[in-house]
């Protein structure tokens, strides 16, 4: 959603050519009609640029002309489409799910897409994905950057913390400000299995500074007061961001539900 909002702003305020690459052509088509089109319609400035009548139906397809901007949604499994479209903004979405055959060699989807920005003085290249493994593309790209984490204020002491899983569950480098997710230690049975109901009821994040229990009801206000901070130097001009679902303030992403999902993996 954040990336879509950023691209929408560019289209409205800084007309651009955009290449949005998804794992497959089918996903690109679906994303265009079910995820992207609602963003355009919700914006009065962008909605007025959408064609009317019969042309509006064709507009929902993978190539769209929005005012002076052009946006193309393509699949990583279509090298010909990737190689023929210059773009100032390239979004590589869910790169860890790109087919193996589209990685490496002449048909490398990531390389082909990034080459499309060469003719622009101020290109933007964005890669995003849910990490799948430590040697996966998105994780390696994150490590090359300045590894920004979202610091939020503790609702009790006000000091900034990072919501995180305990060290034994993650390969992320520690910042020293982690508010680790914890639950009742007695939720683990003598046979090593977990009482998942007890885990869900007791899960919370613990402030490393004042030891306060951070609850789901605190998330919204904490997020509003948060700020992105780099935790490494990274390559010059290379920003990378990590934001786990622990920050999401929805009924599906409570500390308890996420802890249960985590333990069931």
Residue ranges, per PLM feature:
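Phosphate/NTP-binding elements of NTP-utilizing enzymes
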Residues: 1-265
């Amino acid at each position: 959603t954040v990336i879509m909002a950023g691209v929408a702003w560019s289209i409205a305020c800084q007309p651009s050519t955009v290449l949005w690459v998804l794992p497959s052509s089918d996903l690109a088509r679906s994303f265009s009609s079910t995820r992207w089109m609602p963003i355009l319609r919700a914006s009065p400035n962008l909605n007025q640029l959408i064609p009317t009548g019969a042309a509006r139906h064709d507009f929902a397809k993978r190539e769209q002309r929005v005012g002076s901007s052009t946006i193309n949604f393509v699949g990583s499994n279509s090298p010909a489409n990737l190689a023929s479209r210059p773009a100032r903004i390239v979004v590589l979405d869910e790169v860890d799910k790109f087919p193996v055959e589209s990685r490496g060699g002449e048909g490398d989807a990531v390389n082909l897409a990034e080459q499309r920005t060469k003719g622009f003085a101020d290109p933007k290249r964005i890669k995003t994905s849910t990490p799948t493994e430590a040697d996966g593309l998105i994780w390696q790209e994150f490590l090359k950057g300045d590894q920004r984490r979202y610091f939020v204020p503790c609702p009790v002491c006000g000091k900034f913390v990072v919501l995180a899983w305990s060290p034994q569950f993650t390969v992320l480098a520690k910042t020293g400000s982690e508010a680790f997710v914890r639950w009742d230690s007695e939720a683990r049975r003598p046979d090593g299995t977990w009482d998942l109901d007890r885990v869900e009821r007791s899960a919370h994040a613990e402030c490393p500074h004042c030891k306060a229990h951070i609850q789901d009801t605190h998330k919204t206000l904490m997020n509003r007061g948060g700020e992105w901070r780099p935790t490494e130097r990274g390559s010059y001009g290379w920003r990378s961001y990590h934001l786990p679902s622990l920050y999401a303030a929805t009924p599906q992403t409570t500390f308890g539900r996420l802890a249960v999902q985590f333990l069931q993996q």
